């Protein structure tokens, strides 16, 4: 995989979009008492996330949509995300399993949504995907106050 954003995006406080392949993952933990690091092997990316967030709710991105950045969402605020519209299975999973409502950008601009609900804004991005990136990895992270 190119980088972490292509397989994992945090979309709310304890919610993650994830492409969780069957591959084991080696992680390394470093701290002051162990500056050389400690290798920890996990069976999957989902296991890694659950280890560090015991309240994690994982929304799966199918392999077919991983290539089109189905797990690469931009969270503009907790529970408010942008995702390529072509990732229909991922969006369906978010609406059925996560209580998200899917909108087109025009609906958001026109104020056709409830600000208290979790939303996924379906963006076209057909030209952006040619650069092999999704909404999250094509932006600069911001620190929110």
Where are these regions (language model features)?
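Histidine/cysteine-enriched polar flanking segments
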Residues: 1-145
């Amino acid at each position: 995989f190119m980088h972490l954003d292509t397989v994992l995006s945090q979309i709310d406080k304890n919610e993650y979009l994830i492409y969780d392949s069957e591959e084991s993952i080696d992680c390394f933990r470093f701290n002051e008492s162990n500056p050389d690091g400690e290798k920890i092997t996990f069976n999957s990316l989902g296991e890694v996330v659950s280890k560090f967030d015991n309240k994690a709710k994982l929304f799966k991105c199918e392999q077919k949509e991983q290539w089109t950045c189905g797990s690469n969402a931009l969270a503009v605020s907790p529970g408010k995300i942008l995702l390529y519209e072509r990732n229909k299975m991922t969006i369906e999973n978010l609406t059925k399993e996560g209580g998200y409502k899917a909108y087109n950008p025009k609906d958001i601009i026109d104020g056709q949504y409830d600000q208290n609900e979790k939303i996924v804004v379906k963006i076209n991005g057909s030209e952006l995907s040619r650069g092999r990136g999704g909404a999250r990895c094509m932006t600069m992270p911001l620190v929110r106050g």
